[in-house]
């Protein structure tokens, strides 16, 4: 995993109800990313539950996702249990 390779940390942002990973790429590490500090936002079961609750609270007609197929299969269990 990219975050582990660069000794990053994963935290859950309570304001956005989403996890994020923060990691730094140094010049001495090989890879496609240029040197710098990166913040990577993603979804997990906890963040999906929060978003589903929000959609239900406001009676929204559905949910959307970007780039289906990159998620962990367990994510769908969370979606189906909560909709």
Swiss-Prot record:
Gene3D superfamilies: Glycosidases (3.20.20.80)
InterPro entries with a match to the protein in the record: Glyco_hydro18_cat, Glycoside_hydrolase_SF
Biological process according to GO: carbohydrate metabolic process
Coiled coil stretches, renumbered: none
Record-linked SUPFAM superfamilies: (Trans)glycosidases (SSF51445)
Domain of life according to the entry: Bacteria
Domain GH18: 1-83
Signal peptide: none
Sequence similarity: Belongs to the glycosyl hydrolase 18 family.
Name the UniProt record assigns to this protein: Probably inactive glycosylase YkzR
Gene, per the UniProt record: ykzR
């Amino acid at each position: 995993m990219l975050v582990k390779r660069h000794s990053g940390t994963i935290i859950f942002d309570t304001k956005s109800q989403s996890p994020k990973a923060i990691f730094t790429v140094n010049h001495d590490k090989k890879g496609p990313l240029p040197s710098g500090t990166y913040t990577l936002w993603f979804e997990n079961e906890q963040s999906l539950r929060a978003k589903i609750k929000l959609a239900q609270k406001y009676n929204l007609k559905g949910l959307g996702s970007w780039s289906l197929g990159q998620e962990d299969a367990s994510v769908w269990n969370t979606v189906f249990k909560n909709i």
